[in-house]
Each structure stands twice: as C-alpha cells, then as structure tokens.
Regions:
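PLP-dependent class I/II
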Residues: 1-218
Length: 218
C-alpha cells in the first residue's frame, strides 16, 4: 500500500509470540528499580503494569503509551486498506499499475533530459525512485581528470547544499539507502512533470559550475 497507492507509511506487519516467551520471562526477572520504571511508563495500561505482556507493550509503544486505546491500526485505515485490496483485485488488467508506471517513467525521462543524459534502460525499474551516481556522471561528462579533481575538492553534501541554496531543490544522499557516497536519490512520485526537467537542469548546472572551477585551478 505504501508506494502502490501513495500512502507512504501505511505498512502492515505481523508479530507472533508464544503465550510463554522469553521476553515476558526476562521482564519478571528485572530488578526492583527497573520494574519501578516500567510501572511508571505503563501505569495507564492497568493497576499492575509489570504484568503487562511484552506484545501489549509493543502495541502501546507504537505511539504515546497514554494513547494506547488508539494505538496500532486504526479502523479508518483498516477500511481504506480493504478498499485498496478490493480495487487491486478488480483491476484484472492492471490498468492502474500500467498508468502509474507510464507517468513515473515519463518523469524520469524528463529528469534525465534536464541532466543532458540518456535515460538508463532497466526492465525491472519501477520508476518510483531513481538514484544518480554523480561521480560516474562527472567522469562521462567532463572526463576522468576533471572528475578526480572534483572528487578531491567537493563532497556529495556540498552538491546537495548548492542544489538547495542556488535552486531550491532538495534531494537525499544515496548512501543512506545502501548506495555509493556520491549518489543522490530523486523521488518520481509526487511532483508535476515539469518539475523533474527543472531538477535535472539544476543538477547539471551545479556540476558544470564545479567543473569550470577545477579547470581554472589546473
């Protein structure tokens, strides 16, 4: 649901615990001072907070403990997710999925057009996000020597700062998503098509400015 229907954060998960489990056993073995802390934290759940099951504590900790009565999955969310599921089952031709992919693919194409690059072809690409390796781009566009000089003089965080400062464009560093230190992540999910052309152009202009500066110093 999170990505497919544009409800980021609406993820479903399941936790199963045996009625007799090691977590509850360890809670009962805690020292008196530690149990007192638990009593304070979970006092709103009942008069004997130290007897609250570990799995119930997890539910309570999903938001403020005092709001335990509304913790977990809310009824409106359950209804909405049921509607999403029903819609997906009825859409036998995957028209929604195909339309969404076409829209995101076009946005990615405009992004690469702005970067003055040919869009990479990947049959498994969902087009929801795209990651751009800036160092590889620098090598192809301005050559290995200039790219090496840019790598010595700047960091990816400098690129993100200049992009925001000069062009009001906010991107995320890719290394937080298990990518390279010179990669940036662009979401293709929520902006108008023309915005991606402008983002690509802004990215190109920042790197082009860097290339000119390092060439002057060489």
């Amino acid at each position: 649901f999170s990505k497919y229907f544009g409800v980021t954060g609406w993820r479903l998960g399941t936790v199963l615990l045996h009625e007799k489990n090691v977590f509850d056993d360890q809670i009962q073995k805690l020292q008196a001072c530690e149990k007192e802390e638990l009593e304070k934290r979970y006092t709103s759940l009942g008069t004997h907070a130290t007897d609250v099951k570990f799995i119930d504590r997890m539910v309570a900790d999903s938001r403020l403990v005092a709001l335990n009565h509304t913790a977990g999955l809310s009824t409106p969310q359950q209804v909405q997710m049921a509607l999403f599921s029903g819609f997906a089952l009825l859409d036998e031709g995957d028209r929604y999925k195909k339309l969404t992919r076409r829209i995101c693919k076009k946005r990615k194409g405009l992004l690469y057009e702005g970067m003055k690059r040919e869009m990479e072809k990947d049959p498994h690409d969902a087009y929801y996000y795209t990651e751009v390796n800036l160092y590889e781009w620098m090598q192809k566009e301005w050559g290995p020597e200039v790219a090496t000089a840019m790598n010595r003089r700047y960091k990816c965080v400098d690129f993100l700062y200049e992009l925001a400062h000069q062009h009001n464009v906010i991107l995320l560093a890719g290394d937080g998503f298990a990518s390279s230190k010179w990669s940036v992540r662009v979401s293709l999910a929520n902006l108008e098509e023309g915005a991606y052309l402008r983002i690509g152009r802004a990215m190109y202009q920042v790197l082009q400015q860097w290339a000119r500066e390092v060439k002057k110093l060489s």
